[in-house]
Regions:
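Conserved alpha/beta-hydrolase
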Residues: 111-128
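The feature captures the conserved acid-bearing segment of alpha/beta-hydrolase catalytic domains
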Residues: 221-319
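Catalytic active-site module of serine/aspartate enzymes centered on a nucleophile-bearing elbow/loop
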Residues: 306-359
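Bacterial N-terminal signal peptides that target proteins for export
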Residues: 1-9, 20
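Alpha/beta-hydrolase active-site loop
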Residues: 136-192
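A domain-start/cap signature at the N-terminus of enzymes
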Residues: 27-89
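Short beta-strand element of the alpha/beta-hydrolase
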Residues: 89-98
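Gly/Ala-rich beta-loop-alpha elbow adjacent to hydrolase catalytic centers
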Residues: 202-207, 211
Length: 360
């Protein structure tokens, strides 16, 4: 089956899967708000190997998707965190990038549960290297890596090794090992899957692109794309979306290479984020930023594009107070992950200056 035909299958799967998921959730019993039953409230930080949780997990060395490194170190460690001292919002963030403890601390302080799962994300330097790359190549690989279903001819990721199943198995494990933290809230009534309507997909760079691609296929609570999405030669951004357009949020630095090539403006507009407000500079406008979905920063990174790329994530390259060292984008991160999705800015036209057809 060619990648073009698989792309058509993916569109059909979005439409059918979305209806099935909505029907299943409509038939489930209404849930009471999540509350913690923890006699000793605290900030929990847990780790577990995917291969220990699920014996079906396998390595895929052909795409550098490993269980152990070449030196024998565990490569499939997954992280989870929740703070039972904070009133829970009943939302689970699935983070698609390397573990970022500073980010997880902030997510937990907002009342969010957070996990990072081990999934196939190193294929990018191995697959779809032809020039020009097929318009569905990377998008289909992202979807297969996320779902464990056969969307691509270039990789073979079975269900146990897809992000969806690994996230589900991890949450099941957390519900057993850390029951006082309410992880079972995110399992379906029959315990056979995750309640994706309560999941926030998020990532940075490569991970933010996969998060957005997955949300086109599976309806989720929201998407937070930090320094992304990219895939400027791919067409998935304009596909029908199972996740409503108002649930996509983005934040990037203007000196990031994704702006030089119109990658970000293209993805943001094709996804439909312009329908909920203009691009807003968070260094010039205070929260809630006109309730827009498209945020940028232009703080001084000394012309360093590499720093600019990762400056929108908590860490050494983020904007900080020169005296205290405190992060200066705290309000931005809180907004991205907690702004009510039904509160949005006014639509603006797409930009003629942004090149949306980069395959010409």
């Amino acid at each position: 089956v060619t990648n073009d035909i698989r792309a058509l299958f993916a569109v059909t799967a979005v439409l059918v899967g979305s209806v099935v998921a909505q029907d299943a959730q409509a038939q489930s019993k209404p849930r009471a708000p999540l509350t913690f039953r923890d006699s000793s409230v605290r900030h929990y930080k847990l780790t577990a190997r995917a291969s220990r949780i699920d014996p079906r997990v396998k390595a895929h060395p052909e795409i550098d998707f490993l269980i152990e490194s070449k030196t024998g170190q565990p490569a499939d460690v997954q992280q989870a965190a929740v703070d039972t001292r904070v009133a829970p919002r009943g939302k689970l963030v699935i983070w698609l990038m390397g573990h970022n403890e500073a980010l997880f601390d902030r997510l937990n302080s907002y009342g969010l549960h957070a996990i990072r799962v081990h999934y196939a994300n190193r294929w990018f330097s191995i697959c779809c290297r032809e020039n020009p790359v097929g318009e569905h190549c990377r998008g289909n690989i992202r979807l297969e890596a996320a779902t464990g279903h056969d969307f691509s001819d270039d990789i073979q990721i079975p269900k146990p090794d897809g992000m969806m199943e690994r996230a589900y198995q991890f949450v099941k494990w957390l519900a057993r090992e850390n029951p006082q933290a309410g992880w079972n809230y995110f399992l379906t009534g029959d315990g056979q899957g995750l309640r994706w309507d309560d999941v926030i997909m998020s990532g940075s760079s490569h991970g933010s692109t996969t998060a957005a691609r997955f949300a086109k296929f599976q309806k989720v609570s929201r998407v937070v794309a930090l320094c992304g999405p990219r895939d400027h030669l791919q067409s998935w951004q304009s596909l029908p979306s199972a996740t409503p357009e108002n649930r996509y949020f983005g934040f990037s630095h203007v000196l990031d290479g994704g702006w030089v090539g119109d990658h970000y403006c293209r993805s943001w507009e094709l996804i439909g984020m312009h329908k909920f407000g203009p691009i807003v500079n968070v260094d010039k406008v205070q929260a809630p930023y006109g309730n827009t979905r498209r945020l940028i920063t232009d703080f001084d990174v000394k012309g360093d594009a590499r720093r600019a790329h990762s400056s929108v994530v908590p860490g050494s390259r983020a904007k900080k107070d020169a005296t205290t060292g405190a992060y200066l984008h705290e309000d931005v991160w809180r907004y991205l992950y907690t702004q009510p999705v039904d509160v949005a800015g006014k639509a603006v036209p797409t930009s003629d200056a942004c090149n949306k057809n980069q395959r010409q």
